């Protein structure tokens, strides 16, 4: 998963030899083109073993179901377990032991609210903050419902990888248009021009509704770029409105002009 890859990248950058063992596919939630770029350009020093299980784990080695013995200190990044024991007899839990809440972040016990990782769902700091604000407003008798729509996410590597998808847009493959371009050198990427590792951006459009379906960006500025683009997706802005932005150079202004020319 994402956390495993982030931790692996840290140790690899520090000079360690790193193996990632994935029970299914590594980064399966990432667009295939973006994943290929990540493996080739950002994680090239890391050995990735997919469709592999660990059958034996010792202090300084692991043995896989493919009879491979890998030496080194094992580091587990297999997800989180909700620490909900303290309220098990007070509120109702989901099958995975997370707290069951409604869209106002209220648990099954009236006037008891919960937010963040303990409720399951998106285990991201900004989402936990959004849930906490929703819960606080409802506690203060300001009715508010949490909305999980076009949630931006990032994979923190030596170059940030950010992505967002409008899951409410069910455009067909016939109506979907994909545009991918290399990253344009800018702050944080000037010295990568010679290697060609300036990043990559891929955007999927719904040509019928004139809306953005999905954005994937590998860029030093992708965290902020995708964050505000996700807001435009949440308020259902058509593509034409994206051209009204006047941005500070150098940022995404050049990217927008290129993508617009390719689309039109």
Task: Give, region by region, the residue ranges found by the protein language model.
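A short, polar/charged loop-to-alpha-helix boundary motif
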Residues: 222-235
């Amino acid at each position: 998963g994402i956390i495993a890859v982030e931790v692996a990248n840290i140790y690899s950058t520090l000079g360690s030899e790193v193996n990632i063992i994935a029970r299914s596919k590594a980064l399966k939630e990432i667009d295939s083109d973006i994943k290929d770029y990540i493996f080739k350009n950002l994680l090239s020093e890391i050995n990735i073993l997919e469709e592999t299980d660990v059958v034996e784990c010792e202090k300084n080695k692991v043995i896989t179901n493919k009879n491979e013995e890998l030496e080194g200190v094992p580091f587990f990044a297999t997800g989180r377990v909700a620490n909900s024991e303290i309220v098990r007899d007070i509120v109702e839990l989901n099958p995975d032991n997370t707290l069951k809440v409604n869209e106002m972040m209220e648990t099954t016990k009236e006037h008891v609210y919960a937010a963040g990782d303990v409720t399951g769902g998106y285990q991201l700091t900004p989402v936990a903050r959004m849930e906490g604000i929703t819960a606080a407003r409802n506690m203060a008798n300001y009715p508010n419902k949490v909305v999980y729509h076009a949630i931006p996410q990032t994979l923190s590597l030596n170059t940030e990888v950010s992505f967002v998808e409008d899951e409410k847009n069910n455009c067909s493959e016939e109506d979907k248009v994909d545009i991918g371009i290399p990253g344009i050198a800018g702050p944080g990427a000037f010295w990568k021009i010679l290697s060609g590792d300036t990043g990559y951006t891929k955007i999927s459009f719904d040509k019928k509704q004139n809306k953005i379906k999905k954005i994937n960006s590998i860029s030093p500025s992708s965290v902020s770029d995708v964050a505000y683009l996700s807001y435009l997706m949440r308020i259902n802005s058509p593509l034409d409105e994206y051209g009204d932005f006047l941005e500070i150079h150098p940022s995404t202004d050049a990217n927008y002009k290129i993508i617009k020319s390719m689309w039109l």
